[in-house]
Amino acid sequence: MAFSPNPLSLSVPDPAFESWLRDSGYLELLDHRTSAAAAAASSSASVSSSAAATSAASDDVVSSITGGFFASLLSRLVTVSSLLTINPFSKLSADDFSGDTTPWTTGFIGNCDSYSFPSSSQQARMRVHENIKRFARNYATLFIVFFACALYQMPLALVGLLGSLALWELFKYCSDKWKFDRHPSMRKLSIGIGQCATAVLLTFLNVQMALFSALAISYSVMILHAGFRKLTPSKKPTRGR
């Protein structure tokens, strides 16, 4: 039976290898592989441009350096702008909030080596989806902190929020005392009046502005952190005996 020369040197195609990495949960290897490939391509391009610059005129050297700088800057701007087109919650599920909160210093923040610029929009999308699943509870905590800070900066909004809570507690007390459950029409009318009063109170005291500012800041922090945060091993792979 005839075999091709050196059959053991057959390699797995890159798409199949990357698909296996995704299915196995080793996305940090794929992230590292993408960053390494981008760094190798950038270094080879810089070496070739420097070699060409030694044999070119000074004007050509300046133009080539300027063109390379603007091309790199444009590529980075395209990558950053692609973060705005990503739906970060497409792969998020309720189970991601049921686990333990990732440690803030070692897991969520990390060190300086834990961050790098994404080499492409595909890598940025992969990082955002995976990091949001891993740090879902951390991002939720950040939103609560930002919302509390916004309420602290806007005392009227805090008064409006507390007033709306007090209004619904009063409605619950009156409902239990006067037995609104026995009168469905009266209960619906009371709920409608309470909803209108709550909406007017929250709008008049600018609670929606505090909520919007907290959402905007927390969303920006989440997207930037998830896009620039390298994928770290969530669990160690098991080795066969």
Curated annotation (Swiss-Prot):
Residues spanning the membrane: 142-162, 189-205, 209-228
Localization in the cell: Endoplasmic reticulum membrane
Please provide one cellular component term from the Gene Ontology annotations of this protein: endoplasmic reticulum membrane
What Pfam family is a match for this entry? PRA1
Q: Which UniProt keywords are given for this protein, alphabetically ordered?
A: Endoplasmic reticulum, Membrane, Transmembrane, Transmembrane helix, Transport
Regarding the membrane, this protein is recorded as: Multi-pass membrane protein
Does this UniProt record's set of keywords contain Transport? yes
Task: Share an example GO biological-process annotation for this protein.
Answer: vesicle-mediated transport
Quote the function comment for this protein. Answer: May be involved in both secretory and endocytic intracellular trafficking in the endosomal/prevacuolar compartments.
Q: Which family does it belong to?
A: Belongs to the PRA1 family.
State what protein this is by name. PRA1 family protein H
Source organism of this protein record:
Arabidopsis thaliana (Mouse-ear cress)
